[in-house]
């Protein structure tokens, strides 16, 4: 087993033991169809997360796969990308069936499949309770290649022979522990009986209670087992402030002023788009600041050089998109500036949870316009934390 996954050594009882640790660390190396790869990048993915690096390839190769992973690890895209790689777009029939415990999750998955499959002529239908049965029947008769649904409605549609299973290649159970604990066991077992023997089974679950293990032993053949631990990031020890900026256009001056007051050992400045990163970099260079920039459109070797310079301290300020927010430890970062608040709140901890890692203290400063106030409140609530107005003596804190 590769030694880079230290988390695999101590495994509590309800965790599976990983039997697979091959890693594919870029989407380019996965041999995806060109139009699917285009969709992956257009969706905003830069590089695969830990689960995507491990699980996409065995799924594409046709193995049954059990992945133990929490939400927030990138699991939805893992099976969405795999399913889209495997379906025959010329065949109007359900080839991949994805089950989820709730309607909301099923709809969310459908959105991801549709978005990533944007450049492919692929149909994805959400087959969920609480919607019009007749419309469901009509949509299923069109033969969408991917169907996402909740167990009750999917079971009903299979029994009515509306959702035909004869062309099924892949069956995905997302949040299997949730589905089984909600009493869907019988329906799920039933659905298995309708599928062709050759159907590949992919099961994702945060925990591995007995009822989930039963499904894996009854219905899966020699599965690849992948355990992905979610890195525990914390906001402890990180002072979080905001600066109220009246207009978006004034953020640049605010940043310049901040530079004047603060001696920065090293800082990361986050923007939400690649374009903004380039724009801000140019503006700061024009004002004689030394900065480097990093985003997903750069070649990997270019990124590596920039990271090396930043790690060694020869470059002091790095402007980046969320690409940097996951999986890169820069120990000496004392300051993180959110020039833009993250578009989704999960990324907040990935951006600033790093500044204070290894017990180091850190400071995070958020630039907040009137439009951002709601998002900031949501972030505070989500993490049960306080983001306070930046005090005058901020220089003493960094």
Curated annotation (Swiss-Prot):
E.C. code: 3.6.4.13
Residue sites binding ATP per the record: 69-76
Domain Helicase C-terminal: 237-398
Major enzyme class: hydrolase
Motif (DEAD box): 174-177
Residue ranges of every copy of the Helicase ATP-binding domain listed in the record: 56-226
Extent of motif Q motif: 25-53
A cellular component annotation (GO) from this entry: cytoplasm
Free-text function comment from the UniProt entry: ATP-dependent RNA helicase which is a subunit of the eIF4F complex involved in cap recognition and is required for mRNA binding to ribosome. In the current model of translation initiation, eIF4A unwinds RNA secondary structures in the 5'-UTR of mRNAs which is necessary to allow efficient binding of the small ribosomal subunit, and subsequent scanning for the initiator codon.
Family: Belongs to the DEAD box helicase family. eIF4A subfamily.
PANTHER family registered for this protein in UniProt: ATP-DEPENDENT RNA HELICASE DBP3
Name of the featured protein: ATP-dependent RNA helicase eIF4A
Species in which this protein is naturally found: Coccidioides immitis (strain RS)
Gene of this entry: TIF1
């Amino acid at each position: 087993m590769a030694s880079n996954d230290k988390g695999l050594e101590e495994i509590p009882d309800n965790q599976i033991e990983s039997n697979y640790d091959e890693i594919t660390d870029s989407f380019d190396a996965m041999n995806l169809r060109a139009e699917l790869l285009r969709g992956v990048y257009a969706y905003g993915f830069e590089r695969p997360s830990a689960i995507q690096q491990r699980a996409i390839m065995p799924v594409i190769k046709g193995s049954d796969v059990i992945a133990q992973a929490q939400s927030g690890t990138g699991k939805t895209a893992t099976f969405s990308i795999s399913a889209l790689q495997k379906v025959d777009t010329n065949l109007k029939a359900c080839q991949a069936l994805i089950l989820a415990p709730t309607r909301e999750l099923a709809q969310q998955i459908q959105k991801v499949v549709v978005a990533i499959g944007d450049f492919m002529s692929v149909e994805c239908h959400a087959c969920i309770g609480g919607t019009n049965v007749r419309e469901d029947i009509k949509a299923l008769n069109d033969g969408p290649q991917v169907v996402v649904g909740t167990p009750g409605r999917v079971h009903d549609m299979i029994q009515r022979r509306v959702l035909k299973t004869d062309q099924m290649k892949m069956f995905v159970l997302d949040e299997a522990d949730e589905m089984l604990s909600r009493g869907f066991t019988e329906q799920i077992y039933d659905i298995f009986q309708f599928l062709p023997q050759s159907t590949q089974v992919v099961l994702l679950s945060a925990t591995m209670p007995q009822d989930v293990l039963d499904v894996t032993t009854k219905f899966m053949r020699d599965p690849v087992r992948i355990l992905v631990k979610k890195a525990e990031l914390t906001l402890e020890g990180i002072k979080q402030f905001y600066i109220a900026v009246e207009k978006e256009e004034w953020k640049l001056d605010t940043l310049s002023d901040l530079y004047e007051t603060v001696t920065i050992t090293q800082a990361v400045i986050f923007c939400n788009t690649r374009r903004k990163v380039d724009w801000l970099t140019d503006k700061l260079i024009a004002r004689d600041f030394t900065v480097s920039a990093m985003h997903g459109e750069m070649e990997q070797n270019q990124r590596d050089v920039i990271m090396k310079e930043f790690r060694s301290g020869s470059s002091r300020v790095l402007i980046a998109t969320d690409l940097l927010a996951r999986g890169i430890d820069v120990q000496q970062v004392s300051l993180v500036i959110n020039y833009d608040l993250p578009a989704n709140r999960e990324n907040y901890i990935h951006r600033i949870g790093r500044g204070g890692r290894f017990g180091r203290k850190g400071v995070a400063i958020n630039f907040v316009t009137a439009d951002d106030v709601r998002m900031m409140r949501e972030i505070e609530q989500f993490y049960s934390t306080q983001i306070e107005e930046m005090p005058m003596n901020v220089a003493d804190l960094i």
